Amino acid sequence: MQDLNAVQSLAVWAVLVISLLGIGYAFFIRSQILAQDTGTPKMREVWGFIKTGANAYLSQQFRTISILIVILTFVLAASVFIIPPTTEAVERFGSKEAATIWVAIGRAVAFLMGSLFSYAVGFVGMNVAVEGNVRVAAAARKGYNPALQVAYKSGSVTGMLTVGLGLLGGTLIFMVFGIAAPDALLGFGFGGSLIALFMRVGGGIYTKAADVGADLVGKVEAGIPEDDPRNAAVIADLVGDNVGDCAGMAADVFESFEVTLVSALILGLVLGDAVVGTIGDGAYDLRFIIFPLVLRAIGVVASVIGNLFVTTDERKRNAMAAMNRGFYIAAGLAIAASAAATPVFMVNEATGEVDWRPFFATLSGVVLAIVLDKLTEYFTSTHFSPVKETSKASQTGSATNILSGLALGMESSVWAILVISASIFTSVLIYAGEPAATQFTAILYGVSLTGIGMLLLTGNTISMDSFGPISDNANGIGEMAGLDKNARNVMDDLDAVGNTTKAVTKGIAIGSAVIAAVALYGSYFTDVNKVLQQMINEGRQGIELLASINVAAPPVFIGLLIGGAVPFLFSALTIRAVSRAAAQIVNEVRRQFRIPGLMEGKVQPDYARAVQISTTAAQKELISLGLIAVMVPIIVGFTLGVEALGGFLAGIILTGQLMAVFQANAGGAWDNAKKYIEEGNFGGKHSEPHKAAVVGDTVGDPLKDTAGPALNPMIKVINLVALIIAPIVVTIEPGSPGVIIAMIICGAALVWAIWQSKRESEALKEIAQAPASAD
């Protein structure tokens, strides 16, 4: 770790130790969870079905994507011969030959590490959630606080593993590569983002195919309660909560956590180079890199302390207040510690002045997370007028319910983008006094710190999100196992709170994805200009640095239009996948309802068939949607040029954010409008307004849990691909034969991916046509 002073070196080692302690704390909590009671034999039987289905899904998913991960690992290692090491890498390792070897190894290992860490977060998080749900149901028989403790601690395992592994990866790469860290960090971010995309898409399709199928036949047609054991899709629905809301969400936020760190380190290095001497002179001010690492470590410690305050008593029975208390205590500690760290790590050694601007940029991120939290709650909670209006609209049928939800979702996306824009503008104001030569980079560095501040309490955020599916599963197990009324009341209350926490954390996940994408967008400019500057230094004529992108230029405008269209294509394909699989589930549940004795409870449904349908449908889409995310920026960049690729990224960020918020909040509002009616309003359960609300909820399910969340990792994957290929796009001749041939191949792969995603699965046909074991 060259060029670090004694305090900075000590800080980096402390950050490494804290990341390991965070991981250790996660496994300590896991051991506490596993020591809890698993309940009655009937509870363990239902739990066994869920556990088998969840593990089978993730195992099959790993087999599906592992081949692609291995191929991309070798591609990134070989990319060093196309994208040569940076001047920083040559300086760090002493020669171009040594740098080539180290960068090849670094890109491949970092990509593999990012992939494995992201998968580990999803797999372990889901595994602990599955282990926790039956124990929450068992604890509910003892009281409210015991059940709350088990549910929240089960989610805390995922939260602490997310922050521990994310911080560990970034710190290790910096310790090994130093000023050459960006050469490897992009691989780390790309690996995590790609796995998050697979987890989000696969988990979202799985969970909503089962959920939509179970609701349409069970609630609407047969009129039986949710989680009724006679419904053949009920186990697939419960499994889906784990693979979608636990594994998928954990990998998604892990990706944002590491990508904001990656962008902060890349921009911090550029800024640290610019403020000392001249750019490229080998002198760096590394405080801009150390500070983000220290902030992340502070967040880990604050999350651990905050978790200790999540408790309530049998008299108050307020889980939401307990979790909010833990979050706000952690936030207060994190802000205070960040302020205390600023005079230590952000001192200009030349002047002795403390630079408080990074702290204020970080603080704006914490504020942004809280504001988005409240904004999402306003548009999706039963306590506020938007959801009540959607419930009221159900009195005149499902059409007015759906129209009300659509309007609500559209309006909410406007307010969300205004809030995010305000946070970005805050960074502009904070760095308004920065010299013109470094102002652009400094502003974007501030945006990356806003993202770090927003995810400073990732441990608490993930804990609250995972609390939702864990309590939902526990409630389902309690329903199917026939637990007593007191235990059911406890689980009903925790389930209702869990629905709120899931909706709120979705808003934070979307906001963090956009902030991360904007920071990566800034990294795109700095990377392009580094290559252009190197070409100028080599004496190339007619080359200018990329100061801005001219939207009036036809190629840029075309790129902007294509970028704006991609989120719609992605959403269309994921929703269609849910629709196809849900149709198969509907047919299967209808068929099993006709089995003699099943509706009377004398015959057990064949749960495995619905699980198999959902699993097969989810795996079918993974590679094709992954190819779309990787191929489109490559085609745009090499066909239209580097400025057009910048316009393309701007279009992706804008419409991706609007679509993600619209779909998440509209779906959340439809869900809670149904629950508001089920509480006894506008006729209550089994009334005509309730049936209309169930239809609205069913329409909203794939929006809020599949298409909307899948846009988060898609935006970041596309931005990272653009960052990786930017040095080639700048230097290569667009019309050369090699480029034309490569674009034809990429275009063919893209067409195949879209066709593959749209066609009906032969495997699903075979499952539907196969004889059933329960007949």
Swiss-Prot record:
What's one GO-annotated cellular component? plasma membrane
List keywords of the entry alphabetically.
Calcium, Cell membrane, Hydrogen ion transport, Ion transport, Magnesium, Membrane, Metal-binding, Translocase, Transmembrane, Transmembrane helix, Transport
> Where does the record place the site Important for ion transport?
200, 245, 252, 705, 716
Q: Which Pfam families match?
A: H_PPase
Membrane topology, record value: Multi-pass membrane protein
* Cofactor(s) this protein requires: Mg(2+)
Q: Does the keyword DNA repair apply?
A: no
Kindly report, in one word, the top-level EC class recorded for this enzyme: translocase
Output the InterPro entries linked to this UniProt entry.
Answer: PPase-energised_H-pump
Q: Name one GO molecular function term.
A: diphosphate hydrolysis-driven proton transmembrane transporter activity
Q: Where is this site: Determinant of potassium independence?
A: 502
Positions that bind Ca(2+): 671, 697, 701
Cite the binding residues for Mg(2+) 1.
Answer: 211, 215
Q: What family is reported?
A: Belongs to the H(+)-translocating pyrophosphatase (TC 3.A.10) family. K(+)-insensitive subfamily.
**NCBIfam families listed in its UniProt record:** PRK00733.1-4, PRK00733.3-5, V_PPase
| Name of this chain's protein | K(+)-insensitive pyrophosphate-energized proton pump
- Report the gene name: hppA
